[in-house]
Structure formats: structure tokens, C-alpha cells
Amino acid sequence: MLTGRLPQQGRTQPGSTNQNYLFHLDNLSVEYGSICALKSVQLTIYPGEILFLTGPSGAGKTSLLNVLGGYLEPTSGKAILPHQRSTKHFVSTVFQDLRLLNKKTCEDNMWMAYDSSLYGNKNEYFREMEDLSRLLGVYDHLNRKIDDCNGGLKQKVAMIRALLSKPTALLADEPTSSLDKENSYRLFEVLNHFNHKKGLTIIWATHNKELIKQFPGKIAHLDQGRLVYSGHACFI
């Protein structure tokens, strides 16, 4: 829980934005009928940042991720997204609906991200898939059908597929909800490596305060649709 008086210098103020951003939300609101899911959100996310979205259930984290992913249009305000700034930018998502093919194997689902323009050949892609599968403990299950996998294994498959697409940014909504502590940390260690070595921007909605404390990053804390704090995670 966020406690005490939060400093305001971490907040993004209108008109003060460095133009080298990936995402920029300007006074953005989202309404579902009479329900206001996001209220006047002002947020800028820069390349290579790790941003944890925090807040109680119903605070607007999923709605914010859907806006950032281009799946949800704001009711008012403006959202500038990576693909609008450069065709080189690509955003991968791992949301609660993992969009896996249940009758296909783990490996089949990972092949869905293959793009010949990103890899020299299929062998290169498979080696990357193999490496990530070993790191996350999925390798021995590559031939298992998704229908026969538990929730944690499904989340890992979805994450590997997302990383194989070589995204500029990764949006994740509680992607460790079915994983134990050890596997959660292992997953984020892999993501942290991608952040440091490849400049991957990570935006991660989570209730896991211990995970946030273990990895460097910023937080954007939402409450009742309002962004009440954006800045360093030392106020967790």
C-alpha cells in the first residue's frame, strides 16, 4: 500500500514532455457507459523503461494496458502509441486472455510469432525458442497440448511467444498470477535481461509488491481510475 504524502515531481505535467517517448497519454479518460475507468490520465513512458502498474482491483490497470496496446480508444484526451511514431516499433501483449490455441502444442503456439523478416531462418528462431524454453522450464513440455497444461505453464508459453516477436515494448497484465514465487522471479529475471541487453520497454500490471522491490523500475499507481503517482518505486 502506498502511504504518506507522495511527491509530485514524478508526475508527468502537460507541456513538459521530452519528445523521445514511446507512449504518451495526454489528459486521457475512458468511460464505459456511466462508469469512468480512467480519469484525466497524464503519463509518458520512454524507451527502455520498466514500469509497474499498481493499484487495487478495479483501479483501471487493465483499461490502461488496453489503451497502451491500441485495443481501446479513449473517450477523451489523446493517446500517442509507438506504432504511430515509427513503423519499426512493435508492441507485444500478455494479457489475462492468453490467446493460446488449446488443441495445439506449446511449441506450435510459440511458432505463431515467427516472422521471417526478423530472423535469418527458422533454425535461428527455433534456437531462440529453445533457449527461452530452457530458461523458463518449458523445454520438457514443448510437445504437450495447451489443453493439458496448468495455468503457470500457459503463462510461460504466452510470454515466450511474446518475446520471440522481438517487440519494442511488452505489455503484461498479471502474467505471474499462476506462478509460484521462484518461477515469478525467474520470469522477471529473463525480462530484466531483455530490458538491459535489448532495450525492451516493459509495462507490467501487478499486485506483487515483493517482485517490484526486487527489480529496478518505476511505478504508476492508479486509484479509482486516477493516476495518483508516477515515479520511482521506493514508495511501495
Q: Which residues are covered by each model-predicted region?
A:
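Catalytic Walker B motif of ABC-type/P-loop ATPase nucleotide-binding domains
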Residues: 170-173
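Helix-to-loop junction immediately C-terminal to a conserved catalytic motif
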Residues: 69
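Hydrophobic anchor residue at the start of the ABC signature
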Residues: 159
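Conserved ABC ATPase "signature" region
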Residues: 123-141
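Q-loop/switch helix immediately C-terminal to the Walker
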Residues: 104-116
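The feature captures the beta-strand-to-loop junction immediately N-terminal to the Walker
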Residues: 54-56
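Conserved ABC ATPase signature
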Residues: 145-153
